Regions:
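Catalytic cores of nucleic-acid editing and processing enzymes
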Residues: 1-6, 139-147, 170, 184, ...
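Zn2+-dependent cytidine deaminase-like catalytic core
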Residues: 41-152
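N-terminal nucleotide/polyanion-binding subdomain common to many enzyme families
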Residues: 154-191, 205
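Short, basic and Ser/Thr-rich N-terminal targeting/leader segments
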Residues: 25-29, 53, 168-170
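Hydrophobic "anchor" residues
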Residues: 39-40, 182
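Short, intrinsically disordered C-terminal tails of secreted or membrane-associated proteins
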Residues: 201-203
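Short beta-strand scaffold segments in enzyme catalytic cores
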Residues: 29-35
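Short, basic/aromatic recognition patches
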Residues: 5-24
């Protein structure tokens, strides 16, 4: 996939995120799975089929119910197109899960998908220190972050207003330090800074 293709599919994922029913306890996320030849295989968004389903989980489950990347049947054969596919998600895939036995990171790895494109890293709001990015890389997947889409991806989550009580503690409260083995170490991830600016504007604070 080219950078132009990545931008095109991420724009679609952002549109899907806006379809989510807002929740005070979960993010609004959109996801699209695209084959190696550039055709769309599946799409999903948070809470599109039940109140706790995640976007990546939904997209995988629609494409191949019972496949390794789908809940409930980790040993079933997967869709043969998945190893060459890319999954686009507006948020870093979860690495810890309370509502399901397997995280979206685990589902993606099990599905055979080898390329993941995200718009922004998960803030430490519901689960501390999400490691989706790192775990995917450790499993050998190519993981790409598109900071240019961070504000757009955060916008459907403006109802959370998760910065309101943290404002006095500084803008880096929810920006995690990225480990040097994966990226250049930094105290305040620039994409998170853009997200924070967007959410302050959206909430009028």
């Amino acid at each position: 996939m080219s950078s132009h293709d990545d931008a095109r599919w991420m724009r679609l994922a952002v549109k899907l995120a806006w379809l989510c029913q807002p929740s005070a306890t979960a993010y609004s996320v959109g996801a699209v799975i695209v084959a190696a030849d550039g055709t769309e295989l599946s799409r999903g968004f948070s809470r599109d089929s039940d109140r706790v389903v995640h976007a990546e989980e939904s997209a995988l489950g629609k494409l191949a119910p019972g496949a390794p990347g789908a809940p409930g049947a980790p040993d079933a054969p997967g869709d043969p197109r998945l190893p060459g596919a890319t999954i686009y998600s507006t948020l870093e895939p979860c690495s810890k899960r309370k509502s399901r036995p397997r995280s979206c990171t685990e589902l993606i790895i099990a599905s055979g998908i080898r390329r993941v494109v995200i718009a922004w890293r998960e803030p430490d709001l519901f689960v501390a220190d999400c490691q989706g990015y790192e775990l995917l890389e450790q499993a050998g997947l190519e993981v790409i972050e598109l900071p240019a889409f961070s504000e757009q991806a955060a916008a459907p989550n403006r109802h959370l207003k998760f910065l309101s009580s943290e404002r006095a503690r500084g803008v880096c409260r929810h920006a995690r330090i990225i480990r040097p083995s994966y990226r250049n170490a930094t105290v305040c991830n620039f994409s998170h800074f853009l997200v924070i600016v967007a959410l302050f504007r959206a909430t009028g604070r």
